[in-house]
Amino acid sequence: MTGADVVAAVQRAVRDVGAGQGLWSPGDRVMVACSGGPDSLCLLHVMRALASDQALEIVVGHVDHQLRPSSRDDAQFVAQVAQRWGLKHRVAQVTVRGTGEAGAREARYEALKGLAEDLGAQAIATAHTADDQAETLIMRWIRGTGVRGLRGIPTRRGVLVRPLLQVGRRQVEAYIEAVGLQAREDPTNAGLEPFRNRIRHQILPLLKAENPLIVEALGRLAENAHAEVEALHHLAVQGASREVLGPDGGVAVRLELGDLPKERGPRMGIFSHRLRWAHERVRRALDGKHGLQGHQLGRNHVLAVEEVLASARGREVRRVSLPGKVVAVVVEAWVSVVPETWLTTPPALEWEVFPGETLAPGGFTFKGWSEEVTGEGQGKKN
């Protein structure tokens, strides 16, 4: 394959995934998160090349983690590339030392969110490749995961989009060489820390020796898992909830559980999907349109709520804290998922009340009655 063939193939892959999965719309401003490394520099070059055809405006965001003495040089390099290509750019500095992988990732995404807002971008494109997807699946499999975890890195989550997920690292390197770009190299990527580096340098090469197409195979696994989870999710939550909107923009969700199967396996599977969906719905309302940080619900959270639900007695109100300042409130056979703040300062809500008692999210009970007025003006309660 010639250099021109490589360039055409990579650009076609990005264009197809962008159009096929609705990663952007004509007229959007897309911020490419560029570290200066091969993957992100490749993505920036591709997006710039496709901008006219896709009717996009490309801008650049760079996050300086301040972990290496050369990090300022990386920021300067990205700024020079953006200026040379006539692209608006912004740089953010974050402090991630001592926060661990999860903390560093959260700080990076929060910084990207701020840069996107500053630049007025509708989407943030990150340069995760097919190899990154494979490494993620291997890492989750080793640590333990379910079908949801096998979905891997999503092509889109909120404003985050990953147009390079169908492109392998070797293709990226060939693209960079073909267009004559010189990328920055992060020396920490060559070591065996963190865990992902050991997967990249030790485990994945062994798997490639057994199956040279292992990266593509794991990519298909992620796509299949995503499709199956989405299908089951749709069936599980359809008509199974009631939402309440608060004046503060928050949302509470009350789950209907009367239709759950009696068998524990199917019951837990459907309940898990409903609870996760409700949690994500409440979190999305709290996070606003960006929703960069998912505060994912783990199996331990689902089991905790299920245990409380199984032992519920009478009108006793019991609560289980969930990630992201969300609470599951259990009353009898009802589970309501509400923002934590609603339990201390309930917002003013409109709620339809019928004669008798009505349960509302948060464990609140409304008592209602109807009154029939006779000709003599005397009321009769029902």
Predicted features along the sequence, with ranges:
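AMP-forming adenylation/ATP pyrophosphatase catalytic core
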Residues: G3-D39, L56-V59, V63, V94, ...
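Non-catalytic, well-ordered alpha-helical scaffold segments
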Residues: L41, E135-T136, N197, H201, ...
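Short, surface-exposed loop/turn segments at secondary-structure junctions
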Residues: D186-A190, P212-V215, G291-Q296
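Short amphipathic alpha-helical segments with heptad-repeat character
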Residues: L204, K208, P212-V215, G219-H226
